[in-house]
Amino acid sequence: MKLIRQVPLKLVSTGQVVAAEVYGRLDMKDLRTAESSWQVYRPKSAEHGHWRWTDKIPSLGSGTNELYGLWHENECQGLIEVLMDRVSRSPATLGQPLVYINYIESAPWNQSISTSVLKYTGVGSILIAFAMLLSRDAGYNGAVVLHSLTTAESFYSQVIGMTDLGIDTNYDGLRYFEMSQPQSTSYLKKRGLI
């Protein structure tokens, strides 16, 4: 693993903001460690209950897929896989490059659908903000896009503020959300990340 940056993470029990770390260059051992600690808590009924992060390793290193993890106190709090080779579908920015969030997941103890006692709050928001920062670093002006699981649609539209571009019939009927440069700049500024 390689430390990429520190990010703020809020501990629910005390409200304290702690410094967590985003790491890149994750390997099979890192993913197995995360999965083994998550598996006990991950509800099998969840839409993403079948995901296996260790299956993502073969696609890494292709130059377009990148995998990152958010760690605090030697424990993985969330994972995100991004693709760096996608373009916008929005009429206002059609064809412009952006970062595609292929998979994103908070540890089960950080998901309100998995537990009634959350450990940290905002893990998904932090990982999405990190994807926006990757987009800025790549010269894509912070633009990001993703297909949402049904249970997360309101999170992306209401909490993150992404634009809902409708159902993508070519991608399992999932809704397609995009965050433009002005939206991401506003989002990152509100959180003190730029």
Short names for language-model regions:
Residues 1-118, 126, 133-143, 151-154, ...:
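Non-catalytic substrate-recognition and accessory regions of acyl/acetyltransferase enzymes
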